[in-house]
Amino acid sequence: MELKTPLYDAHVKAGGKIVEFGGYLLPVQYETGVIKEHMAVRTQAGLFDVSHMGEVLCEGKDALANLNQILTNDFTNMVDGQARYSPMCNEHGGTVDDLIVYKKSDEYYFIVVNAANKDKDYQWMLRHQFGEVTFKDVSSGYAQLALQGPKAMQILKKLTAEENIPKKYYHAVFDTEVAGIPCIISKTGYTGEDGVELYLASEKAEEMWNTLLEAGKEEGLIPCGLGARDTLRMEAAMPLYGHEMNDDITPLETGLKFAVKMAKNDFIGKSALEEKGTPSIKRIGLKVTGRGIIREHQDVYVGDKKIGHTTSGTHCPYLGYPIAMALVDADSVEIGDTVEADVRGRRVAAEVVALPFYKREK
């Protein structure tokens, strides 16, 4: 059965084109269209409904030990209010999911997982828990809104005191409020822009949504759908589960070495990653130089030799040209090399470029 977020009716009323994603009915775009929504986030501000994401509480004396065992990153030195990104590996080193962990206190962590994986992730956590710890799926009680763009903070400051807003990226303020609505304010996002993600009670979602849109009118804030969220994350070269990673692809192959702490005593998948050694494949960026757009699942060649396949691809509104990401043989190409993708039997040329494609000016 397809699920609806608390904002479903608001999306329909606003002219959102509804599609299924991760088991949920969500707007892929509004009447403004993907390009305008994308550009609003790069130049002004956009508001996304991300309530399909899953939330899990991890509580207890052994919460930290459990996180360090189940996840690849190290959570030992986190301070209260800090957030940390991490892959979660299976015993073979493949990626179960990628997620964000927020620390509220030594015995209380708030975990945010991908929508399509939330049941799988929760069961994985329960299966591997040990000691004094409780994992609790609280997804149904939460809505998540993402306010993103260079003017996001300007808008937010109209609705809450500055001390309620995290100063640093990947930090959060718990038990705070925006426009009198209780929430968690997190300085995170999936767009490559400045901004926040707000976690709040589901029943308050529509009130918060309308309040933010009204407050941001002067700054050009508009609602944005999944289409713009995807093109924005591609420009920022952020991996998406099911594309750049899955149960068979390791986080090291995806280029997430920064979030895999091999110096830790142990974690699920560590021995498999050690056995594999240096990754045999790598994620690369492609700037399309030929005619056409390279989408996902296209074979990539150097001459007649197939070296891998694309995982995501689109035309980027802000950059003004098509891009793609691909997983290829690790020693096959370097930055500056030319490759070709097979697009429905036709070869389309592309240059290997450094990731990310887009990085905002600080």
Regions inferred by a protein language model and the residue ranges of each:
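Acidic, proline/glycine-enriched N-terminal capping motif
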Residues: 1-86, 94, 227
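Well-ordered mid-protein domain cores that form the structural environment of catalytic cofactors
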Residues: 74-128
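Membrane-targeting and insertion segments and their boundary/processing signals
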Residues: 37-41, 92-95, 99, 179-186
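Acidic active-site catalytic centers that drive phospho-/nucleotidyl reactions
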Residues: 49, 98, 197
